[in-house]
Amino acid sequence: MIVFDNDASTEGLVETISQGGNNLKAGDTGIVYQQYKAGTALANSTTETSLFTGTSIAPQLVGNMAQAAVATSVPIPSIPAGFLALGTGFSGNIYGTIASTGTPTLRVRVVLKNSAGTIVYTLADSTATSLSAITGTTELVVNFDAVCSATGVSGAIIGRIAVTYGTTATANTVIKAVATSGAVDTTQAYSLDVLATWGTASASNTLNTLIGTIGVY
């Protein structure tokens, strides 16, 4: 297991994380956020909502899983000002369930928020896409990457996302978004999140994240 700050005590890191202080630092790599229990399902709503609502840990910030369990339900690590360097990237994998009635639209996007929680940049976006008819409750898989390609006030990040969902127990459909480059001021601090939005509110339109990870490289 990769451990951040090898010269720091694990006990101190656990305490820092439990107090919400799991901020990234220059040189940090590995899995920095892991949801391991299902959260609240996004259902009967058209409100854009985070896909990370379940119980979580920051596994790479502590020495072992037993100690990591002390720091449950941590926020996704903050990205401090200046952290993003050329080639620095984020990757994420989300596995969950989805069900719908009819063919509603679904949008999933990866965003950066400022300290006030306001979305300031969209790194990757599936856009609102009409789903194929879904039979029963099937799997939902979201994969994304976002890589810094320029730094400074006029910095840039290239992002891509793919959303795979089952139309039946044995057939899948993939929503792919072409990788795009967007302007990002890397001198500012941010938080990263993955958001989903249903186009139609229905109790039958529901999705939930069972497990999910965010990594830094």
Task: Write out the residue ranges for each language-model feature.
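Surface-exposed molecular-recognition determinants
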Residues: 3, 7, 27-217
